[in-house]
Amino acid sequence: MMISKKYTLWALNPLLLTMMAPAVAQQTDDETFVVSANRSNRTVAEMAQTTWVIENAELEQQIQGGKELKDALAQLIPGLDVSSRSRTNYGMNVRGRPLVVLVDGVRLNSSRTDSRQLDSIDPFNMHHIEVIFGATSLYGGGSTGGLINIVTKKGQPETMMEFEAGTKSGFSSSKDHDERIAGAVSGGNEHISGRLSVAYQKFGGWFDGNGDATLLDNTQTGLQYSDRLDIMGTGTLNIDESRQLQLITQYYKSQGDDDYGLNLGKGFSAIRGTSTPFVSNGLNSDRIPGTDGHLISLQYSDSAFLGQELVGQVYYRDESLRFYPFPTVNANKQVTAFSSSQQDTDQYGMKLTLNSKPMDGWQITWGLDADHERFTSNQMFFDLAQASASGGLNNKKIYTTGRYPSYDITNLAAFLQSGYDINNLFTLNGGVRYQYTENKIDDFIGYAQQRQIGAGKATSADAFWRLSRLRHFLFNAGLLMHITEPQQAWLNFSQGLELPDPGKYYGRGIYGAAVNGHLPLTKSVNVSDSKLEGVKVDSYELGWRFTGNNLRTQIAAYYSISDKSVVANKDLTISVVDDKRRIYGVEGAVDYLIPDTDWSTGVNFNVLKTESKVNGTWQKYDVKTASPSKATAYIGWAPDPWSLRVQSTTSFDVSDAQGYKVDGYTTVDLLGSYQLPVGTLSFSIENLFDRDYTTVWGQRAPLYYSPGYGPASLYDYKGRGRTFGLNYSVLF
């Protein structure tokens, strides 16, 4: 985190973020703005909850220095787990539990647990990022660990142009290089303004600390040999002094190269363990992994609506996720099918928030949320003989089936939040959210039975469908102590809700032997036998923060507990099981600007433990889910026009009661920049000491997929070795 020589607080509602961003951007570089990730119009100093803000300068230093977004956030946010170094942010928990990601108040998490929210926007379009930790009942399901709200750049009244170009390489191969280029133009007047941007990035091959090519992730899909395009437009219309309209539109595409793939050896020998998988060219597949998405949001705000502040937002977003071809393997380690899934989500919704102050010292925030989501998916099967002969590179479609049940989800919610200043020292906060969820599952034939029909081994099968309704009340309460103007302490309780993936939950059925070509359904997951339940999390927090001229620190002890868990089955479906689980830890950050020098230093950390209750005794939790502790540190030196920063990230060991272990590792980076007469030249050396290591996801993946889907070596995903980056950026 950066520290400036001025202390400024900005009050901001997340639904007002897009409206206020231009005003924030006009502040001088030596001012620190702090925003609230709460739906009430409060500053961080008025919040009884841990909140972090990643400012534009901090984010640009990391991104222009060559860091991928997930790596940059893990470096800057104390409670966020280290990056998977893949396309996905799967397993990147906040305080050991799932997170929600929003862009300008629009939720990117869908009911499906595909974790590509951080593969949904290019960092070039980000102005700043705010993070709120702990369960957040004001944002509905999924936010049991916390949320990340990405605030995008907006147009200014004056004409401005941005340009950025960069490259990155480890010089291990002619294919070992990434390139990026981005540009934007913005302008207008005091009544109307806008911004249009285009950002493109091309990833080449990646190599580990030993100079060997890292494996493509065929489970969550990787970024090697892929392209990313982000086109975004925003517009702001100031109707009068109190009313404003703002429009945000985006097209995003991140897709793998259509020439490079994971070679599994002739006859899929790597799956049997008789050869080593490797990345090679020659891919010829009818389905390429990637992410496509569209976003449009229209927001209306009125700061003088019947004596209240009103913000209304309507939005639409869609995404199409395609996965890498993956084998189906029998007990004899023979590949019986080779296929790839595509999962599509369409979502629209609205948010209405009103803030009022009925009397001095009393604030009320209330509102309504509504959204609807449609999910469909399919599985494309490839000619097995051709795929086998080519090691999984020549993939020609032969038929397509459904992958998970299609479904519609409707959410309706009402919330009320209030804050009352008891006196000059204490503020009491509290609120409630009521949420109604309806899941309607379409008729669905079991996935394995669809394969039999597609392969001609059966002609028909029974289908099943489901309709379920969920109702939840979620509460929060907090007490804030204003010790001094720059210093606060707080005690907080909040509830969050994790909603299981309906497709994976209901997509199971037991069928009998075919009768005249028809497969009869004998048993399935149904509402009466196994009602879909949410996992409610109770979260407690005791914290303290201090923001001074040279020192900024925030520390919190936290504890969360739940009595159910979502667990993955061997067939990649899920179940909700009784499982009393608790997570507790201490998280914090200290940043210090050494007076009368150009030096600064800082550290952030998250030390936690995850346990489940087994036969009345608390035991270490499964390492497939339990988050490791983490610490980062930096030393900065910024004599004008230079800026240099050495930083480290450490993920610590974590083990479970079954004896499994995820090994920790430390990486060190050097980031720097030089201010030219026109523009800025940034440079970096990532993984400075060329550390050879397996990522956290690379150690977890074998526990999910091996030996059932091949040897552990097939899922040994390494981190990238030493890489050098160079970037030029200019704003004029």
UniProtKB/Swiss-Prot annotation:
Motif (TonB box): 31-38
Conditions for induction: Under iron starvation.
Pfam families linked to this entry: Plug, TonB_dep_Rec_b-barrel
GO MF annotation: an example: signaling receptor activity
Domain TBDR plug: 43-153
Residue ranges constituting the TBDR beta-barrel domain according to the UniProt record: 158-732
Signal peptide range: 1-25
Entry keyword set: Cell outer membrane, Ion transport, Iron, Iron transport, Membrane, Plasmid, Receptor, Signal, TonB box, Transmembrane, Transmembrane beta strand, Transport
InterPro entries according to UniProt: Plug_dom, Plug_dom_sf, TonB-dep_rcpt-like, TonB-dep_rcpt_b-brl, TonB_box_CS, TonB_rcpt_b-brl_sf, TonB_rcpt_CS, TonB_sidphr_rcpt
Topology of the protein relative to the lipid bilayer: Multi-pass membrane protein
Motif TonB C-terminal box mapped to chain: 715-732
SUPFAM superfamilies (alphabetical): Porins
A GO biological-process term: aerobactin transport
Gene Ontology cellular-component annotations: cell outer membrane
Cellular compartments annotated: Cell outer membrane
CDD domains membership: ligand_gated_channel (cd01347)
Primary site of residence: membrane
Family as reported in the entry's similarity comment: Belongs to the TonB-dependent receptor family.
Function: Receptor for cloacin DF13/aerobactin.
Protein name per its UniProtKB record: Ferric aerobactin receptor
